[in-house]
Amino acid sequence: MNFRFASGLSFEFLKGESSMYLATTEEGVIYRCSKSYTQQYLEIYAGHNGPIYKVRANPYFYDIFLTCSADWSCKLWNWRRDSPLNSFQSLDLYDEVIDIEWSPNESTVFASVCKDGRLELWYFVFYSGIWRKRTCLTLFARLGIEIKPKWRLKLWFVSAKVTPSL
């Protein structure tokens, strides 16, 4: 039996699956694990080219999750597939995405924070297997993010830019 040790950076329990969780690593892979099978992982997901700093389960769809990485991108996943559903990256971003959070009110809205101080609010539409639209609002702020119910979000920012239909 081959064992592999990877440094974990983040973990998240899947919504609706209390015995399963996702763990991100410095090696750029995500492991789906079970509390019942502690000696091995259930699935491995590879799609990032650097450390994965955060994983967040979608609060509305139990099989959807989001990751952010040092490779300048956020990726949308379905834990039933081994490759990402989509990748989100600003055209002018050349820095690590260090934090992400889903909106508590909308199933297709999330925010990301980058190492250069920008906060990006992403909105996407996926209908009948086709990506219809992706929009990004970029705010330059400080690091860290937490979105509270009813969109309570305090930020200090210098400028804002909307990038429609990336």
Region annotations inferred by a language model:
Residues 86, 98, 104-158:
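Structured C-terminal portions of repeat-based eukaryotic scaffold domains
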